[in-house]
Amino acid sequence: MSNRIAASGLIVAALLAVSGCATTVSSGLGKAEYMLVGIDNKVVWGDDGKLQNLAPGKDTVTIVDIGTDPASPKIVASLPLMNSIFGPPTNLAITPNGQLGLVANSMDWVADGQGWKASPDTKVYVIDLTVSPPVRIDTVAVGKQPSGMAINRAGNLALVANRADNSISVLSIQGKQVKLIDTVTIGEQVAHVAFTPDGKRALAAKFPGHKVALLEVDGQKVTYAKRDLAVGLWPYNLDITPDGRLALTADNGNAGGSDGNVDTVSVIDMEANPPRVIDKVVVGEAPEGIAISPTGRLAVAVLLRGSNNAKTDWFYNRNGSVAILKIDGKKVTKVGEVEVRGLPEGAVFSPDGNWLYIGNFMDSDISVLRVHGDSVVDTGTLLNLPGKPASMRGRTQ
């Protein structure tokens, strides 16, 4: 039987110290380390696999401490903020110093006389993580349907992929001030974006274009280099290794859903001039989330496996899974797979790489996995959430 952790104490927590940094709070076990979880309670899938839109008003951005006791994460607070599953599970981020959280609300919810429909939103929430409880301090207007986002290691620049605007918003970060300073036109729908460790380049996933765009970054000036890399079908998500040598893309294969066919993770050599795809690794069916360990030795691709499809579909599975990828130099190899729960979305490693957290949308919980070298095992511990986890992200490393 799984060890389930109750979702209690949702609004109030006493984890913050005089330092004012959410990631440096001392405790008897360790230091608090925050993870943001976007809870979307407006969307459900029925047994027939059909999506249903429910009335809004119950979404939250839930803040989870994964540092004090990594084996038993705890909810610190839940802020009543609308957010959406309609985008990759990376529409939020935490600054490297742990002081700010940014959350993009991809879709607004509009009454159409017969129910509710999704319409592109333009909001990025700014959350102060240094106060107890954390609180939203600002909302920044960006492009339409802001989705995957990234913050550079310097903590002074953020990029937001605007799917409905075919653009990327550039945000400056100074202390607790976040401002829109530029918009980069891409010309095609972009789902996610990631900085290289040195902050001089970024990659953007051109979801329906089956490509990755290369961006150049000079200070606060971001330009589209007009160079694209052909990856697998429907690249929804991507990440870059801590040493900057490789990038990995989650090639979903079916426009964000499952179809029963195996799909790939594309491997990009970032040291090559110009960068290029050097391999495609078969990982399983419908990878959506992807994350690289802070150690740089391991990555995971989160597989949907038809877990939100009709139960009568031949490729339906009750649970999704996590493909384990070993990184050895520039060779990436699938070395295992761990079953989790229904419609897994986000994946977050602990800062030391010893723990892995997977958000299970259909089951409203988070699976806690233990990492031992190249092996990942399910501990059986589940953190109950106040709703369905559409996205998850830890502190920028």
Where are these regions (language model features)?
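Intrinsically disordered, low-complexity segments
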Residues: A6, A17, T24-V25
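Predominantly soluble domains enriched in secretory-pathway, periplasmic, or organellar proteins
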Residues: C21-Q397
